[in-house]
């Protein structure tokens, strides 16, 4: 079966470098400040900022809690972050692009679906569960980034 793709985007009212810095910082920014409550038990295992960061987490969706571990890469530093779940075939890409109002941020997830009836159910449910989760995350990102800009603070130490 072809992979399942879910993509949500919105304009964030902050400069791209600030927003990218928040997303790349798993110690103080990304997970601490913007993740919806469906994510829990977030633990940075290695790194913490940018490529090489490894994070463990729990995600509760559709009444099920899944534990996972993901590794962060930066295929295009300053523009694209890529989270790859280490057990499974799930990748989530965070794309930050300049826009007149600040920047446009897109969260895109691609995951492999199961074969047969389970795959059909996954194809129906994954977008319905992930899209609202990502919309909430992007709204939280917008609020947090706007607060940082208003306070004239960098996204995190070492990231401009």
For the regions a language model picked out, list residue spans one by one.
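Hydrophobic/aromatic beta-strand elements that line small-molecule binding cavities or substrate pockets
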Residues: 8-10, 59, 68-74, 91-98, ...
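Beta-strand/loop substructures that line and gate deep hydrophobic ligand-binding cavities in soluble
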Residues: 82-136, 152
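Glycine-rich portal/gate segments that line the openings of hydrophobic small-molecule binding cavities
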Residues: 28, 41-88, 104, 136-160
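Beta-strand elements of well-folded, non-transmembrane domains
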Residues: 12-14, 61-63, 76, 111-115
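Short acidic, gly/pro-rich beta-turn/loop elements at beta-sheet edges
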Residues: 18-20, 31, 65-67, 93-94, ...
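Conserved catalytic core of Hanks-type protein kinase domains
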Residues: 22, 75, 132
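Hydrophobic ligand-binding cavity/cleft-lining segments
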Residues: 1-49, 160
């Amino acid at each position: 079966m072809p992979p399942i793709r879910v993509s949500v985007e919105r304009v964030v009212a902050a400069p791209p470098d600030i927003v990218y810095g928040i997303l790349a910082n798993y110690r103080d920014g990304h997970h601490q400040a913007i993740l919806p409550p469906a994510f829990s038990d977030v633990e940075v295992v290695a790194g913490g900022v940018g490529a090489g960061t490894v994070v463990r987490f729990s995600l509760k969706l559709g009444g099920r809690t899944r534990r996972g571990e993901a590794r962060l890469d930066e295929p295009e530093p300053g523009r694209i972050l890529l989270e790859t779940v280490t057990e499974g075939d799930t990748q989530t890409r965070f794309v930050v692009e300049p826009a007149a109002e600040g920047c446009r941020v897109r969260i895109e997830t691609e995951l492999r679906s199961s074969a047969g009836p389970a795959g059909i159910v996954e194809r129906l449910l994954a977008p319905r569960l992930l899209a609202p989760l990502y919309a909430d995350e992007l709204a939280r990102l917008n609020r947090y980034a706007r607060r940082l800009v208003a306070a004239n603070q960098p996204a995190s130490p070492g990231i401009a």
